[in-house]
Structures are given as structure tokens and as C-alpha cells.
Amino acid sequence: MNDREFRVVGLRRTGNHAIINWILQQVDGTVVFVNDIFINENPFRTVVEVFESQDPDFYWRANRIKSNPLYAGEDYLDNLRKEANRDFIPKDLLIFSLEDYRLKLMDVKRYQKRHLLYFGNSKEKTDILILRDPYNLLASRLKNERIGLKTRSYLKPFADV
């Protein structure tokens, strides 16, 4: 069982990682950060599959979790497999981020049930919602993607702004 769990929710380019990194610097003990999870997939199983397949499109993303001491060293894959198979390693703090999800998708019973299967239980749970000024968010996304306004589906809601 985890002592604490932070679920961080925000749109891409809202400063999620800056805030999460700030939190990580404030906490001692066993801390695990799972970045940009998919709501309907076991994030640990996904990471294990990526490492085993060495898919270059996703390897860089999964490789970040190896920076955590819990998954470092030669047995990192064994520890990740334990987590994927619901043999959870106790953590002082578990942080996971969700990016570009509608909030109402996270309150349904199906999500809550899967959450327990994927992460186990935590004594204390905290939701963190990160907001950013919509004009700055749009400008950041456009600059980061170097794309036209109508080419990405997540930018279309801003087209009328």
C-alpha cells in the first residue's frame, strides 16, 4: 500500500512537469512518478512491454522511469513486472499524471476500479488540477508543435478564441 498518492491532471503544455518536479524535490522516501498514463491501460505493463520490445517510438518515454532508484539497476525489469502483475512495491508517494483527459472520464466507477488494479491502494489521495491561461496555453502549443491551428484535434477548440 502507498502512503500517499497524487493524481496530477492538466492539459499538455500547462507546466505539469515543472510542478511535479518541484513536488519531487520536496519529498523524501520511496517516490515513484509515472508520466502521462493512458486511462485504460496498466502503465507498468505498458512500460514492461516497451522495454521488452525496445520499440524506438516509445522507448525514450519508458526509459525515464529507470531514473527512479526503485526501478534502477539490473533488476529494474523484475520490479516493473511485479508492479504490472499487481505485486505492488510500497511507496511513500506515488505520483501519476494524466494529460489532455476530460475530467468526467476520471470519476466513473470503471476508472476507479482499474485504478486499484493498476496502482494498488493508497492511504491518502490528493488530486492536483493544473490550469493555465488559455491564450498562453495555445501559444505554447503552437510554438511547440510548429503547426497550423486546424491541423491538430486538440487545438480545434481554441479556433474560435
Listing of model-derived features with the role each one plays in the protein:
Residues 87-161:
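PAPS-dependent sulfotransferase catalytic domain
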